[in-house]
Structure formats: structure tokens, C-alpha cells
Swiss-Prot record:
Residues 96-113 bind DNA. It comes from the Bacteria. Belongs to the HicB antitoxin family. It comes from Photorhabdus laumondii subsp. laumondii (strain DSM 15139 / CIP 105565 / TT01). This is Antitoxin HicB 2. The gene is hicB2. GO terms for molecular function: DNA binding.
């Protein structure tokens, strides 16, 4: 996944207002009376849609690079997306990752939950255990 996790949006307008859709994440839909209002609500819609992927243990698609506008994924969420996708790509269960980290499966369940705050070092350690390295870049 790219260093910047920014998902492109598509706008549609009719007499009822503006709709925002994410071509890469079709579950993420929102709208507003104005284009600006719809875009302001888009990040919440995107993160809410990610919850469905986490619950179903489905890989979250990589963002495409072309769009009218983009919505940035918060760093704390982006790190968890990277962890979930890595677990799925390596077919690593919560129990297996817990064994690799010397912790309980319940702790891994919290780590891969979007509703639970997790220290970035914890996510980095989990990715390291799966053979990946979490890299943060300021641009």
C-alpha cells in the first residue's frame, strides 16, 4: 500500500444535494446539501466502511491514484489497515499472531479493531512479527 493512504472520491449532484462515493470502497457512501458538506463527511463514511472489512476479515483495497478529490485515512486507521491486510495476505490468524507476539488472542482482537485505540509501537511489533516493517514518513 502507498505511503499515503488517500482514497479518491467521486461526486454526484442532483436536486436533493451532493453524494460522495469511493470507487475503491463501494460500501462508503455519504452526502450533504453542499459539495463541501458531503466531502467533510466522507472520511467518517470511509472509516465506517472499513469496519465492514475488518468484521468480515476481508482485505481492504489499495487506493487508486486518480480522482476529483481525495480523502486521507487517519494514520492510526491506516496502520491497522496495513496490519489487517498483512494478516490476510499471510493467512495469519489472531491466535497465530498472538503466539508470535507472546500474548493472548483477545489482545490481537483488540489490536485489529478500529474502535480500540492501539499504540503505534504495538502495531509495528505485530507487523514485524509478520515480516513487515512499518515506516512513517513526513512530507
Amino acid at each position: 500500500m502507498s505511503k499515503n493512504m488517500r482514497y479518491p472520491v467521486k461526486f454526484e449532484h442532483d436536486e436533493t444535494g451532493w453524494a460522495v462515493m469511493f470507487p475503491d470502497i463501494p460500501e462508503a457512501l455519504t452526502g450533504g446539501d453542499t459539495r463541501e458538506e458531503a466531502l467533510a463527511m466522507a472520511q467518517d463514511a470511509l472509516v465506517t466502511a472499513f469496519d465492514f472489512y475488518f468484521e468480515d476479515r476481508r482485505e481492504i483495497p489499495t487506493p487508486s491514484t486518480k480522482g476529483e478529490a481525495f480523502v486521507e485515512v487517519p494514520a492510526s486507521i491506516a496502520a491497522k489497515v496495513l496490519l489487517l491486510n498483512t494478516m490476510l495476505q499471510t493467512r495469519t490468524s489472531n491466535a497465530e499472531l498472538a503466539r508470535l507476539l507472546g500474548t493472548r488472542p483477545q489482545e490481537i482482537q483488540r489490536i485489529v479493531s478500529l474502535s480500540h485505540s492501539t499504540k503505534i509501537d504495538t502495531i509495528a511489533n505485530a507487523l514485524n512479527a509478520l515480516g513487515k516493517h512499518l515506516e512513517l514518513v513526513a512530507i
